[in-house]
Amino acid sequence: MGLRENDDGWDFKVLILDDEWVLRIPRNEPAAAKLATEAGLLPALAPALPVEIPRFEHASREPPFVVYRLIRGEPLRHDDPDGVRAFLAALHAFDASGIDLPRPDWLEAWRENAARFRDVVLPLLEPGERSRGEALLQEVETLVGFEPRLTHCDLEACHLLVRDGRLAGVIDWAGARIGDPALDYGWLLNDPFPDWDVDDELRRRASLYYRFGPWFAVEYGLRTNQPEWVRSGLENLRSRL
């Protein structure tokens, strides 16, 4: 019996058994609540998507954990742009009205993010960087005017799995909520697929979300006393200011 551990996740500890089964264990109560949300969403969502997503074979409430078959694949680089767009279209067209999901007041939630960043991240920047950081924080006021849709909220390379050159699976749905679909384009438009033809306003908001990504990493590093997260987060933050 082989056992591999992935301890990198913010919310979950992951164990892989015999290269076949994934055991996902929340680190705290908020993560356990996210896991319960996933358990309610994924069975309804799976038939609507052109890719694999986790299908929980076992879900325990106490202690909280889930088990599902490993979805095989390598992290997305520049593969299968048409397949990725087909996945996004299906995801954002999904009617989640009957599913218990977070439905935050989007602007207010981002105002709260900005307030935290202003308190704990902005002071870590050099004086010459702070004005640009403050200008970015003020741009959260422009995150309006979109039709809220189901969003994954954490689409990056390690959550988009490719087999034989095609997008085959999407994992880690803990952040799924009703929100701005531009958030799901943030990394995609600013790394693997910058030439995609998309609406200018969607691209603008996606760029904002991408620029804010490292602020969350710095905050996480400070909160969990992990200096490496702070260091790498600040490096990425500066590159996106």
What are these regions (language model features)?
Residues 35, 81-84, 133, 211, ...:
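Hydrophobic packing residues in well-ordered alpha-helices of helical domains and bundles
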Residues 1, 72, 80, 93-153, ...:
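An alpha-helical support segment within catalytic cores of ATP-dependent transferases
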Residues 32, 119-124, 128, 200, ...:
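ATP/Mg2+ or Mg2+-diphosphate-binding catalytic cores
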Residues 30-32, 146-151, 156-208, 212:
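Active-site Asp-x-Gly
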Residues 2-106, 122, 145:
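ATP-binding pocket architecture of kinase catalytic cores
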Residues 43, 189, 219:
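A cross-family signal for key residues in well-ordered alpha-helices
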Residues 10, 48-53, 72, 95, ...:
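FAD-dependent flavoprotein oxygenase/oxidase catalytic domain
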